[in-house]
């Protein structure tokens, strides 16, 4: 896997760890990653750079291999906030090839960086601070002091529903990923096993040989979820 440019014995995070390692190691000026549940933001944090997951629909997903379609987004990985804004402005355009594409709303982000933050409200969920390491907590508190000195209003609030976020994420992500991976059957595109007896044998061998063990476990584990969601959620959608 990709190594952390600041310490080769450490990982770069994932899943967009390769691009974060390249940008953090000054191999690339910027990069694009895909983020479903932190895959841009986590490696960017590990490598000491800026990673942004845009609002859903702001950036076209056309060409991205889908994992969980309702959560996937493409975003910039850069060494500064200014660069992130410039790259985001360049990629946040409406694309008719993506049915969920909305494009950027409002003024270009790079232009808004010149504005001060006086009077802006910045919310911090108390639950996010639970279990945070002391040095990380101090870094957050130091950042809060900077924002306050610049005129921002810091608001601490409770988010009790946060405890459901992870299980809900895994239910939706696994079910959608399992469905999306169903297209890789060796018929249209992707890997195809060279030896098979019939169509069923070809599909079974293709998916067994082409998918790693972790992906196979995900597909099998998600099947009951897909059936349950399709039955109970039919009227909602």
Positions of PLM-derived features:
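Acidic, glycine-rich active-site loops and adjacent beta-strand->loop/helix elements
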Residues: 36-40, 44-46, 128, 160-161, ...
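A short helix-breaking turn/cap at a secondary-structure junction
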Residues: 53-141, 200-205
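Short helix-loop capping/hinge segments that flank enzyme active sites or metal/cofactor-binding pockets
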Residues: 116-123, 175-237
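Acyltransferase
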Residues: 108-111, 132-159, 189-194, 205-206, ...
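Short glycine/serine-rich loop segments
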Residues: 1-91
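Short glycine/threonine-rich loop-to-helix capping motif typified by GTGT followed
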Residues: 166-175
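Short glycine-enriched loop/turn motifs at secondary-structure junctions
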Residues: 67-71, 163-165, 237
């Amino acid at each position: 896997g990709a190594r952390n440019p600041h310490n080769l014995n450490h990982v770069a995070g994932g899943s967009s760890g390769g691009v974060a390692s390249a940008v953090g190691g000054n191999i690339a000026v910027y990069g694009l990653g895909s983020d479903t549940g932190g895959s841009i933001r986590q490696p960017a944090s590990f490598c000491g750079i800026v990673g942004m997951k845009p609002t859903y629909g702001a950036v076209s997903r056309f060409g991205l291999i889908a994992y969980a379609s309702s959560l996937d987004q493409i975003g910039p990985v850069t060494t500064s906030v200014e660069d992130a804004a410039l790259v985001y402005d360049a990629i946040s355009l409406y694309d008719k090839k993506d049915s969920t594409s909305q494009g950027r709303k409002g003024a270009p982000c790079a232009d808004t960086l010149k504005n001060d933050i006086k009077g802006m409200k910045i919310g911090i969920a108390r639950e996010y601070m639970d279990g945070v390491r002391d040095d990380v907590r101090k870094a957050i508190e130091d950042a809060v002091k900077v924002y306050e000195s610049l005129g921002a209003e810091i608001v601490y609030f409770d988010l009790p529903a946060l405890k459901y976020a992870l299980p809900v994420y895994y239910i939706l992500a696994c079910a959608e990923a399992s469905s999306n991976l169903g297209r890789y059957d060796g018929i249209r595109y992707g890997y195809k096993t060279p030896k098979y007896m019939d169509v069923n044998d070809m599909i079974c061998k293709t998916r067994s040989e082409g998918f790693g063990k972790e992906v196979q476990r995900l597909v099998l584990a998600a099947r009951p979820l897909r059936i349950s969601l399709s039955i109970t959620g039919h009227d909602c959608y």
